[in-house]
Amino acid sequence: MWKINRINEMKQITSSNELRQIQMDILSYVDGVCRKYDIKYSISGGTLIGAVRHKGFIPWDDDIDIMLARSEYDRLVEVMTNEYNNGNRRYRIITHNLDNDYLFPYAKVFDEKTLLIEHVRGCKNFGVFVDVFPIDNVEDQSMAKTFPKMRVLYNMLTMKRLIWEKQRPLYKNLAIILSRLILLPFSNHWIISRMEQLAKKCSDSKTDKMACLVWGYGRREVVPTYIHSEHIYLPFENREYMAIKEYGVYLSTLFGDYMKLPPKDKQVTHHDFEAYWKD
């Protein structure tokens, strides 16, 4: 992890266009690796809405997400790690198993020439990134137990990152401190490992539903398995990236009428960070 004691010597990335260009370069590298190794991925979430509705970024969005079936996800982590270790030192994929400072149950691909400081406790300073989410098999009979368990683990992970804040009511701060004391025996990595184990419970089963279990929108993530079987390329800004062919089923399940713009007060970014060039 990059030390930030030289931050005053770094050039800050203040332009949203510059930030987006870096993110697209990361995605283009991932796309190239996926083409090389015949790995199927799809842009997802707001990135997919952007491609369909705007032919690029949602105007107020500031990140890029992709998703892969668990088997493809594992392959991507493996081949990108090998590419990095074999000399491509610009782009690095990280999971909690690859870096002890990384505390999420999904992967990110970072640009090693950048530094990104997120103003959230527990988020270490890596670089500008693209989020990479695994999609897992889901069985109807297990969903009633899986989602509540995953929610508990997610809340545990979130609670361990909260700190005392002056603007927060005293009783809430005290409740957070008490909760964090109760959670002391459970490390972040233990929680993430439990989330992964729970998500991969049906990996060896053929199911008719899939979902991003480790993060996201809970039951709204559940979609028919068949929509992950065919992929196409969609225009995004001045490039093309892979997407599931049945993106309409996926997007309407998650977001309803995804072609309708949200109210003006909802058209805001949800991330708080600063980005820099290291050199």
Regions found by a protein language model. Name each.
Residues 2-7, 11-35, 80-140, 160-164, ...:
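Conserved catalytic core of two-metal-ion nucleotidyltransferases
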Residues 31-64, 68-74, 226, 253-254:
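Active-site nucleotide-donor binding segment shared across nucleotidyl transfer reactions
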Residues 57, 72, 156, 274-279:
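Short amphipathic alpha-helical patches
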Residues 77:
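Helical (often loop-to-helix) elements that flank the catalytic cores of nucleotide-handling enzymes
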Residues 141-148:
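A short secondary-structure junction signal
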Residues 151-166:
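Short, cationic low-complexity segments
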